[in-house]
Amino acid sequence: MKLNELYNNIGAKKNKKRIARGIGSGKGKTGGRGIKGQKSRSGVAIKGFEGGQTPMIKRLPKRGFNCISTKKYNIINIYNIEEALADGRLSADDNITKEKLVEARVVNNKNNKKLVKLLSICSDDFAAPLSLKLDAYSAKAKDLIEKAGGKLL
């Protein structure tokens, strides 16, 4: 036996039935779609329809709630401000505001839509006395800034 003499067993490989290719093909004319109606036309699928059984969307209970007035915060940490001060992107003499943080690329805040909250994760000491004007602060961040001689405007 050689490679060029190999072949499939009879019936092992079956050609698929080509539908809607003439009446003589056995699957012609309507091509298995029935007669007339929305589902016989091309490009139509009834979204969420499961053949008459109660759809999944109706079987599952309603759950949850999206509060419209939820405040979305851009979260920064004290060490982010320390890095910007070390790089020279921020000045310790100025009032640090949301706009200055955007300019210094500490916060990515398109059109100033989000609020900015300062946290103190990974920071246990803070040396520079800064004056900050942000939207929110964690309790630990407030303590660290005030201990360093800074102000929250």
Curated annotation (Swiss-Prot):
SUPFAM superfamilies: Ribosomal proteins L15p and L18e. InterPro entries: Ribosomal_uL15 (IPR030878), Ribosomal_uL15/eL18 (IPR021131), Ribosomal_uL15/eL18_sf (IPR036227), Ribosomal_uL15_bac-type (IPR005749). Keywords: Ribonucleoprotein, Ribosomal protein, RNA-binding, rRNA-binding. This is Large ribosomal subunit protein uL15. Part of the 50S ribosomal subunit. Residues 21-41 are annotated as: Disordered. NCBIfam families: rplO_bact (TIGR01071). GO terms for cellular component: large ribosomal subunit. The keyword RNA-binding applies. GO terms for biological process: translation. Residues 23-35 have a biased composition (Gly residues). Belongs to the universal ribosomal protein uL15 family. Binds to the 23S rRNA. Pfam families: Ribosomal_L27A. The gene is rplO. GO terms for molecular function: rRNA binding; structural constituent of ribosome.
